[in-house]
Curated annotation (Swiss-Prot):
UniProt organism field: Pseudomonas aeruginosa (strain ATCC 15692 / DSM 22644 / CIP 104116 / JCM 14847 / LMG 12228 / 1C / PRS 101 / PAO1)
EC number: 3.5.4.16
NCBIfam families: folE, PRK09347.1-2, PRK09347.1-3
Protein name: GTP cyclohydrolase 1 2
Pathway membership: Cofactor biosynthesis; 7,8-dihydroneopterin triphosphate biosynthesis; 7,8-dihydroneopterin triphosphate from GTP: step 1/1
Residue ranges crossing the lipid bilayer per the database entry: none
HAMAP family: FolE (MF_00223)
Domain of life from the UniProt record: Bacteria
Keywords attached to this entry: GTP-binding, Hydrolase, Nucleotide-binding, One-carbon metabolism
Disulfide bridges in this chain: none
UniProt-listed InterPro entries: GTP-CH-I_C/QueF (IPR043133), GTP-CH-I_N (IPR043134), GTP_CycHdrlase_I (IPR001474), GTP_CycHdrlase_I_CS (IPR018234), GTP_CycHdrlase_I_dom (IPR020602)
Encoding gene (name): folE2
Organism ancestry: Bacteria, Pseudomonadati, Pseudomonadota, Gammaproteobacteria, Pseudomonadales
Biological process according to GO: one-carbon metabolic process; tetrahydrobiopterin biosynthetic process; tetrahydrofolate biosynthetic process
Family: Belongs to the GTP cyclohydrolase I family.
GO molecular function, one term: zinc ion binding
Length: 181
């Protein structure tokens, strides 16, 4: 059974008439949208980075902040929307600027929980760059908590992962946290 057929079945199970005008192409559109929203499964870290790793003598923090992200909660298939802040301390190599955002997107475009996604992003940046430290903070609003369940409209979730120098050195961690405020 195709994804489109599954969506048609879901609509029918909800009591909808899949032959009414407004729903005629909905299963097809929904299947296409879900494939797009989950395209991270079709990507690899090597493909996303695409060789954009450059030699550098820089040993100071590199920070890309306010990277917008859109993901789907793996528990309810509802969106969570937020921003990621990703920093690393280079160890002879720097990553092409857009590649940090592409790494975030690769992991966000999967069925996820924010806690795991934060760690996956940090470990990916560490793996690719060999950085002395990596820090990731993500703040997001979860529709599964806003639209259903407790229905808390102003809540957000913050997760952080600190590796290497960011975990071991309070001054480095504090500098990062002050820069993302």
């Amino acid at each position: 059974m195709s994804l489109e057929q599954h969506y048609s079945s879901i609509l029918t199970q909800l009591g909808e008439d899949v032959n009414r005008e407004g729903l005629l192409d909905t299963p097809k559109r929904a299947a296409k949208a879900m494939k797009y929203l989950c395209r991270g499964y079709q990507q690899s870290l090597e493909e996303v980075v695409n060789g954009a790793l450059f030699s550098s003598d820089n040993s100071e923090m590199v920070l890309v902040k306010d990277i917008e992200l859109y993901s789907l909660c793996e528990h309810h298939l509802l969106p969570f929307i937020g921003k990621a802040h990703v920093a690393y301390i280079p160890n002879g190599k720097v990553l092409g600027l857009s590649k940090v955002a592409r790494i975030v997107d690769m992991y966000a475009r999967r069925l996820q929980i924010q806690e795991n996604m934060s760690r996956q992003i940090a470990e990916a940046v560490q793996q690719v760059t060999g950085a002395l430290g990596v820090a990731v903070v993500i703040q997001a609003q979860h529709m599964c908590m806003m639209m259903r369940g407790v229905e808390k409209q102003n809540s957000s979730m913050v997760t952080s992962v600190m590796l290497g120098e960011f975990r071991d050195n309070a001054a480095t961690r504090s500098e990062f946290l002050s820069l993302i405020r």
